[in-house]
Amino acid sequence: MITRKLMLYMTCFTLTGLATTARADDASPPQSTLSVGLAGQSLPRYSGSDKRRWQVVPLVQARDGAFFLDSQKGIGYDLQSDSGLYLEHTLGYNLGRSDQDSDWRDGSDKLRGMGNIKATVNTAFAVGWTLTPWLTVEGKATLPLSDGQGVNYQASAILIPMQTTSDTVAFSTAALFGDRRYMNTVYGVSDRQSERSGYAPYQAAGGFYGTDSSLTWSHQFTPSWAALASVDYTWLDKHAQNSPIVFRHNQTSATLGVLYTF
């Protein structure tokens, strides 16, 4: 359950191109906007899977001043200072993981006997600093509210090597961390799960468990129509990599999306 901003936290994947553009632009303060669209994704069936799936997800982004709604991050608000420091707080939803193949959330038949990871409401706090118009650093913590699945953290940097009136290229990289409960929810195999699935028991240690990097290009066709393309690479460290349910420790995802802004 790698945090994709792509995160798409729906999990995975993180769609951050437009948000990155907004933070990097030191023009006018946020105004009321509404954008809707669709994105197609090719991604692993779950964090550590060696199989892939395709999915189409709706994109909704609405903002009124400091408050926003985002189909990937949830609802929230952000506060920004003239110095470049900002605080973001969101309330979102994680779809969990199934122990069979799924077309709409993480899951695989290879996890049969492991049981499902419940969907959960979560809250996330992020603190960042836009050091220059082309470089932002951020720390983020995501905590579950409706189920005790542990806390995950990430420390990230976003670099914008190119930005014009119509095109933005952004590169982001993040170090991923999780407490012991989170790591064992996602990568651990309990004695009971071992008996039911046939996998060897495994207790994952908390701490650093991987990196997540993405390259995103967004293009503004007209004031209303925009498109984005993103490629994401995730690498799992030994604390996750040594789990018997991890069959591939380096994974890629790809996203293509179209947005219409009213």
Residue ranges and their predicted role:
Residues F171, S218-F262:
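Predominantly the C-terminal beta-signal and adjacent terminal strand-loop region
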Residues D191-K238:
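Glycine/small-residue-rich hydrophobic helix-like segments
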Residues S28-L34, W54-V56, G65-F67, S83-L87, ...:
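Outer-envelope beta-barrel architecture signal
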Residues S71-A170, R180-G206, H239-A240, V246-R248:
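Outer-membrane pore/translocation modules
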Residues L43-R45, N94-S98, P144-S146, L176-Y182, ...:
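Structural signature of outer-membrane beta-barrel domains
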Residues D25-Y77, Y86:
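Short glycine/proline- and aromatic-enriched beta-strand/turn motifs that initiate or cap beta-hairpins
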Residues L38-S42, P58-D64, K73-L79, F125-W129, ...:
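Residues on the lipid-exposed face of transmembrane beta-strands in outer-membrane beta-barrel proteins
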Residues M1-T33, S49:
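Cleavable N-terminal export/targeting peptides
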